[in-house]
Amino acid sequence: MTTQLEQAWELAKQRFAAVGIDVEEALRQLDRLPVSMHCWQGDDVAGFENPEGSLTGGIQSTGNYPGKARNATELRADLEQALRLIPGPKRLNLHAIYLESDTPVARDQIKPEHFKNWVEWAKANRLGLDFNPTCFSHPLSADGFTLSHPDAKIRQFWIDHCKASRRVSAYFGEQLGTPSVMNIWIPDGMKDITVDHLAPRQRLLEALDEVISEKFDPAHHIDAVESKLFGIGAESYTVGSNEFYMGYATSRQTALCLDAGHFHPTEVISDKISAAMLYVPRLLLHVSRPVRWDSDHVVLLDDETQAIASEIVRHNLFDRVHIGLDFFDVSINRVAAWVIGTRNMKKALLRALLEPTDQLRQLEASGDYTARLALLEEQKSLPWQAVWEMYCQRHDTPVGSQWLDSVRAYEKEILSKRR
């Protein structure tokens, strides 16, 4: 440990103690908050089922940065490189298309055995796993409908895929000793004016009820459902709207997924957390950065990321909110994208833990909004970065931007040789 880092740490402890904050306790709390990294940043949401196929479902990965992972071995190696550069607890979020098999496997036939390599890898890296059925990039989703499809046979295919995915998710939780959160997102919707808004939603309701009919131990598996405002090709009507899934999660007591990019640009999910928590048992967050639409840019340490973290900490939602990331930027180094986004999420959580929330609540309750604003702003200038650097040091991860040297070396030695 450098003398400079030690000195900064000691000064930071004193500064935060002056406002009633125990920085050691803040770091202990930070170690209770895993962030689930998404595997699909590493290969542009291609997966291993049909890596050369088109990405569909109204989503896009844009850019042409070299070094994309081409198989599971490369993807796991890239993830390991990123994991080494991120302090504290992590998880990994997988999609169904990241299965491994020597022969083609239909999506409604996926089994735990197709993910055993991921489980063994997760054990070796002390990670929990989360899961998602993949209801896009498939011939049977080409017309824009899956679980709400008017054709009963196609609809059943997607129901069976989601049911099979839940068994995989439960397998993850059983094997790893930590529940897998399985999130259902579907692209279903229409490009232009839609006459019958009700029938597709009725079909989706019934399909979801069938999907979740098999019971699993909540210590192994947690169901979540995710809404979206619109997607490319589904600008006018989305079957799985916010109101639909809020009602579904409330009535069925599943987790509700809030994605930062899935709402109108003037809406923020940080303000939705406290409202939703009054009705649903759990929330899954997909922290992302929408630029004018659901563009899935890399997460920044910006106002909304901070607000999301502050909501979790201020309301002590550690055991009810699951933090996941969802972005895929192909214009920059993919390993760096993971590191930047995940470290930023963790920085936001730390800053929230270093806030004198009790004092701020008292000021708010007494109507002293002047002091509330003053303290909130002064808090931003306190030396939280010295606490972050100590956290990195204790977890044997690089301090500051030193991690970029490791990424550059990995790019030169490994990524640049991929064609």
Swiss-Prot record:
It holds the Pfam family RhaA. Pathway: Carbohydrate degradation; L-rhamnose degradation; glycerone phosphate from L-rhamnose: step 1/3. It comes from the Bacteria. The keyword Manganese applies. Catalyzes the interconversion of L-rhamnose and L-rhamnulose. NCBIfam families: PRK01076.1 (NF002203), rhaA (TIGR01748). This is L-rhamnose isomerase. It comes from Salmonella dublin (strain CT_02021853).
